[in-house]
């Protein structure tokens, strides 16, 4: 398995040795390069996910989807982006302009920081703390502040109702996500994402060696993650039939585009975290006793494994969205507090018991 830290160490040595940069200059240059990489990946994956969403939706509805702009409609997303860039940004007269303009940037910032937590390959992790899981959960909650500010500052009752729904929904379902992650922390014994992936590379994917509690945690995570992203059938904060467009009703132009961008990147982040915690992240598929097969799997780059697993989970989440009908807000909160939270707590105890008794593969 290729270790990407070789490249980062070479770059640091090149900047300090060949280019003659001081320590602070080399670190500053590396930080700028990393920021450019994050922004580029952010844009590329957003475009890919929007196109994938339209094609998957069309598949489930027996349609073709975008087919006119470019070959197989590939350029449709770019035309939509161009249209959004040329639209005027309009603000309501009675709205709080400062908070109204600040809210979309808070949502995108939270999405970018959590996007940087994903371990792309062995040695290729931008943010890697020994409490990485807690940091991820803390940063992901910043987006709630942006949504609440958007609803309140718009001076629109529909926006405010959508923001309050979204805040209640996201805060509620964070409990289930946190407890499913705690179950996997019990299994791996660490909160660092790089160490979680390394542990699965050596001992097998968590969903395979964690027995039934790991499978239950994975299913709960899929449901809670879908609700966390405000996607169907949990898209009550922006349901068109009731609230026009929810908390971003009064947004236009690229301010609306930021919310659209953050929604799809949050979907990718949710799926990427599922592949990291449960499916090994960049760790390849290994089958005990088949050394030749395992050697071939190790040749495939870790980034390919990670992106492939992530898009598989993205497809599962899109499948959920276009299959199930929308729930009412009371049904959504009842599902979390009456079912998912108790199941998550019991499942966490079961996982701790399995680890304590050594009942893992």
Regions found by a protein language model. Give the residues of each.
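Selective transmembrane helix interface/packing segments
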Residues: 1-361
């Amino acid at each position: 398995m290729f270790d990407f830290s070789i490249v980062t160490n070479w770059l640091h040595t090149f900047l300090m040795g060949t280019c003659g940069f001081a320590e602070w200059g080399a670190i500053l240059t590396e930080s700028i390069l990393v920021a450019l990489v994050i922004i580029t990946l952010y844009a590329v994956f957003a475009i890919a996910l929007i196109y994938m969403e339209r094609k998957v939706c069309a598949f489930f509805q027996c349609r073709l989807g975008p087919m006119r702009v470019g070959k197989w409609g590939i350029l449709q997303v770019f035309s939509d982006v161009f249209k959004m860039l040329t639209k005027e940004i309009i603000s309501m007269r009675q709205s709080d302009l400062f908070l109204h303009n600040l809210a979309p940037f808070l949502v995108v910032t939270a999405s970018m920081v959590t996007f940087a937590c994903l371990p792309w390959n062995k040695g290729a992790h931008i943010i890697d703390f020994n409490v990485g899981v807690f940091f991820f959960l803390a940063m992901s909650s910043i987006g709630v502040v942006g949504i609440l500010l958007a609803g309140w500052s718009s001076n629109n009752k529909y926006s405010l109702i959508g923001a309050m729904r979204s805040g209640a929904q996201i805060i509620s379902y964070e409990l289930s996500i946190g407890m499913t992650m705690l179950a996997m922390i019990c299994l791996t014994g660490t909160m660092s994402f790089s160490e979680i992936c390394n542990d699965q590379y050596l001992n097998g994917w968590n969903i395979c060696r964690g027995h039934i509690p790991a499978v239950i945690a994975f299913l709960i995570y899929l449901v809670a993650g879908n609700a966390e992203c405000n996607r169907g059938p949990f898209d009550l904060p922006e349901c068109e039939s009731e609230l026009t467009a929810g908390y971003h009703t009064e947004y236009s132009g690229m301010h609306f585009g930021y919310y659209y961008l953050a929604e799809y990147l949050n979907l990718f982040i949710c799926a990427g975290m599922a592949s990291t915690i449960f499916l090994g992240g960049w760790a390849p598929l290994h089958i005990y006793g088949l050394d030749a097969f395992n050697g071939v799997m190790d040749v495939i780059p870790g980034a390919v494994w990670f992106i492939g697993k992530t898009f598989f989970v993205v497809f599962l989440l899109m499948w959920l969205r276009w299959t199930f009908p929308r729930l009412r807000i009371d049904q959504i909160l009842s599902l979390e507090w009456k079912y998912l939270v108790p199941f998550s707590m019991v499942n966490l105890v079961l996982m701790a018991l399995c680890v304590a008794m050594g009942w893992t593969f």
